[in-house]
Amino acid sequence: FKYTTPGSILDKTRELVIETFEKSASEIKDGMDVSLLCIDIQNKKVSWSGANNPLWYIQDNKLIEIKANKQPIGKTDLVQPFTTHDIEYKEDTTFFLFTDGLADQFGGPKGKKFKYKQFQELLISINDKTMQEQSLLIDKEFENWRKDLEQVDDVCVIGIKI
């Protein structure tokens, strides 16, 4: 297709998903949230675009959030082109792509949602660990929070340290 920016890739993906849904005998009102990151290691730059899912990155021990376009890949009332964000990064920057499953998980002492603020605080607190250690600590925190409650959604967290 010759699309090179995350925003244009998400635009084309949305077009293809809608086209596919329209071929169905029944009306499909579904979509997906996506976060797409392209890494240019030589120029220390990333390009990112998101459909409902933000990008978080930790640089100099500060968590920075880049907000996503508030629209899914799929049919939506107001279709706008997806924005591509270009970010220059320093060595030892960690990027996080994730679904809403961890933040939406019920648990803890009061059976409440984990929430994004708590998720951010967790990521900052474990930032000095290796990515493998971070993975284990996130999983442990999730299980300790959830305890015996049912998992409510898929949980996917991708961390990339550059």
Predicted regions and their residues:
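Conserved subregion of the PPM/PP2C metallophosphatase catalytic domain
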Residues: 1-162
